[in-house]
């Protein structure tokens, strides 16, 4: 199964992605993780991406599209994949759709974790206060969180609204508990084994 998971910062995308990929036995492909890995490896791409991520801005589309295309063609994606955090705007969506055609792939569902802006902000700011391995992510400061929320509302939400009429679009109430959100996704896509 090939899934695309949409939602704002703090919507629970990462949590649901981890659950679904375990249940389905498919890789979780996160552009954020790919970019952080490049940054940790000290690559030129990672250094370039770092400056954008630290400001809460989007990394240029072509860099992301090329990375995603390469990742979707890895051997571990044969049974499917879950793509989290991409596409993020209308331009990326158009290039992404063309890229999928060029590599002869398609997606089964566009899952949207629908969470109001005020709740997204509260969740994201709470996450920033929680350290991961004793360290806060450099892109999880209150300033960059607010910037990411603004970018989401300006760039990503209009793209999601365009996808709403797509027959594969599946809105999910993301304000519910983790378990309830997972159950709602399972009910809608119908192919995930129940826990």
UniProtKB/Swiss-Prot annotation:
Residues 30-59 are annotated as: NMP. ATP binds at residues 10-15, 127, 176. GO terms for cellular component: cytoplasm. The keyword Cell division does not apply. Belongs to the adenylate kinase family. Keywords: ATP-binding, Cytoplasm, Kinase, Nucleotide biosynthesis, Nucleotide-binding, Transferase. InterPro entries: Adenylat/UMP-CMP_kin, Adenylat_kinase_CS, P-loop_NTPase. NCBIfam families: PRK00279.1-3, PRK14527.1, PRK14532.1. It is an enzyme of class 2 (transferase). One of its GO terms (molecular function) is ATP binding. Residues 126-140 are annotated as: LID. Pathway: Purine metabolism; AMP biosynthesis via salvage pathway; AMP from ADP: step 1/1. Monomer. Catalyzes the reversible transfer of the terminal phosphate group between ATP and AMP. Plays an important role in cellular energy homeostasis and in adenine nucleotide metabolism. GO terms for biological process: AMP salvage. It catalyses: AMP + ATP = 2 ADP. Its main location: cytoplasm. It comes from the Bacteria. This is Adenylate kinase. AMP binds at residues 31, 36, 57-59, 85-88, 92, 137, 148. Consists of three domains, a large central CORE domain and two small peripheral domains, NMPbind and LID, which undergo movements during catalysis. The LID domain closes over the site of phosphoryl transfer upon ATP binding. Assembling and dissambling the active center during each catalytic cycle provides an effective means to prevent ATP hydrolysis. It comes from Thermosynechococcus vestitus (strain NIES-2133 / IAM M-273 / BP-1).
């Amino acid at each position: 199964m090939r899934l695309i998971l949409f939602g704002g910062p703090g919507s629970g995308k990462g949590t649901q992605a981890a659950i679904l990929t375990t249940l389905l036995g498919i890789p979780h492909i996160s552009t954020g993780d790919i970019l952080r890995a490049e940054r940790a490896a000290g690559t030129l791409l990672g250094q370039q991406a770092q400056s954008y991520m630290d400001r809460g801005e989007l990394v240029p589309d072509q860099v992301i599209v090329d990375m995603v295309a390469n990742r979707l063609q890895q051997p571990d994606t044969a049974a499917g994949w879950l793509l989290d955090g991409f596409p993020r705007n209308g331009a990326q969506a158009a290039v992404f759709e063309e890229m999928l055609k060029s590599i002869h792939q398609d997606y089964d569902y566009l899952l949207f974790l629908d969470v109001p802006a005020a709740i997204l902000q509260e969740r994201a700011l709470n996450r920033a206060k929680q350290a991961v391995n004793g360290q806060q992510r450099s892109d999880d400061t209150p300033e960059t969180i607010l910037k990411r929320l603004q970018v989401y509302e300006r760039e990503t939400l209009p793209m999601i609204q365009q996808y709403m009429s797509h027959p594969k679009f599946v809105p999910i109430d993301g304000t519910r508990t983790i378990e309830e959100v997972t159950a709602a996704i399972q009910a809608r896509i119908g192919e995930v084994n129940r826990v």
